[in-house]
Amino acid sequence: YFNNLAQRKFTVLKDNTNPLLDVTFDGVHILNNDIVSPNPHIVIELNDENPFLILNEDIDTANFQIEIKYPNSSNWNRINFFNGALANLEWHINEQENKFIIEYNPLFDQDGIYKLRVQGQDKTGNSSGDEPYQINFEVIQKSSITNIYNYPNPFSTKTHFVFTLTGSEIPNKLNIQIMNINGRLIKQIHLNEIEDIKIGNNMTNYYWDGRDEFGDPVANGVYIYRVISEINN
């Protein structure tokens, strides 16, 4: 038999790479001071590229700091995972991608500006950034459609529609009717059937190309539009 011994030096480098933090509200990366639903689905993901240090569902909650500041308050309220944990807070691990996923479904019952602050760390202690992720968002309880306009205006080939939706429910009917100055309907657009409408600011992917219901170009001039919406009839 062989009785050989081989030795070789090797170096282990410390993990210095920051994990990636991603935060969405109802599937959207919101901008600062955007309007959101009073009961949003907030998803927080921490993605670590190190395949040798797998995040742990039970232990690594300590590596997160999630805080909310309510309207007219100067205090940050920490969201707890265990002692005093909220029923609307869940978390799990995607082991294949080494991703820690937190799902938070709060009910914000005050109108006003809220602040969310999040910081996460991987197993080595690398933070997701030098500063915590922080964003302001606004909650408006009343259901309304405001700030409606088409863009660009005037237009030559196509125009999109922009509007702000508030409240907690998406209308099950949201139509835009375009009429001439005599009030005759020339085009009806069923936005809820062709658009992914969300609470907050919306700009349609759909564009009106200046054609009527029969596909014929309309004459140059001024046209009027109105919005008809229904929530649960």
Ranges and model annotations:
Residues 48, 120-124, 180, 212, ...:
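Surface-exposed loop/turn motifs at beta-strand-loop junctions within extracellular Ig-like
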Residues 126-127, 184, 216:
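Residue-level signal for well-ordered, solvent-exposed loop/turn and beta-edge residues enriched
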Residues 66, 118, 175-177, 208, ...:
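Generic short beta-strand
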Residues 1-152, 156-158, 166-168, 222:
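Short, compositionally biased serine/threonine- and acidic-rich segments at solvent-exposed termini, linkers
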Residues 109, 113, 190-232:
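Short, surface-exposed loop/turn motifs with a glycine/proline- and acidic-biased composition
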Residues 31-33, 173, 196-202:
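Glycine-centered loop/turn motifs
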Residues 136-151, 155-182, 188-193, 204, ...:
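Glycine-centered coil/turn sites that cap beta-strands in beta-rich domains
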